[in-house]
Amino acid sequence: MFWYVIPFGKSFDEFWFTYEIPKDFEKDIKVGQIVKIFLWEKETFWVIYEIFENIPEKIEKSKIKKIEEITNQKSFINAYRIELLKFISKNYFSPIHNSLNLFLPKNLVEKVKKGKLKEKIKEYKYFSEKKNSLTTAQQSLFKEIIKEENKKILLFWVTGSWKTEIYIKLLEKYLKEWKQSLLLIPEIVLTNQIASRLENFFWKNLIILNSTVSEAKKTEYFLDIASWNAKIVIWTRSALFYPFSDLWIIIIDEEHDNSYISDQTPRYNAIEIANKISDLSWCKLLLASWTPSVNSMYKAINWDYKLLNLFEKFKK
């Protein structure tokens, strides 16, 4: 067996290398694992991009070397995320190694080099004694979201309708089924009512992150998500690239907000990325806004999204 590897933590030109898989590694090898290669007599780290049985004819087998070491048994970029990586590189004209940087924390390679990449078993306790009561309209909408066959839903709501209660009910449902959920909110509202309300209901052990969180803490949360310890994640657009093991719903609040479009290399649109994740997996996508974007409304009109409304204002 052979594999393609792409550079991790280094800037190379647009290429990948072909290496042979030693027979001792064949049973344990997976796409997305980090491997060690001595390149030009230097220790470098790469990610397995593709595995194949037969070597391409244009490559001389005698020139192919073997991987030195698999540095971590866990695959941080599973098969469908490799497809997502390819999509980003092609759709946004981004070199593959630049796109890869979206999927792995900056200091991960340093932990790999030092042999300090160890998962800590962290127990997350989510539920409080508080109950989440829905109005008749909210309960009806919740059931419709769950039963809807179209995985992609656009929720058009009015101010005062308390759509956060719908979010909580959805997160609670998937948590009880031991599944992972992701709620994306704009950077500017990370400390707003949504985050506070969710903290009050699920306690403070759910993951809530923003750009002020340190790289070390991001890596810690990265490992918690990969190991399935963390079930509920609230974050900005970059959370889409984290290694969820069993992600069943992505909720994007204020989907019209410009902060979902990255202006840094590699540039990307988080709404498009979330759509692609839904296409590549079983994940349901819920886009919510009181002023939906033109693109989202167009998709709803053309049945790419199921359009649902929440126009009833909540009364205490």
What is each model feature region?
Residues 1-291, 296-297, 301-315:
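Accessory, non-ATPase domains that flank or precede helicase/AAA+ motor cores in DNA-metabolism machines
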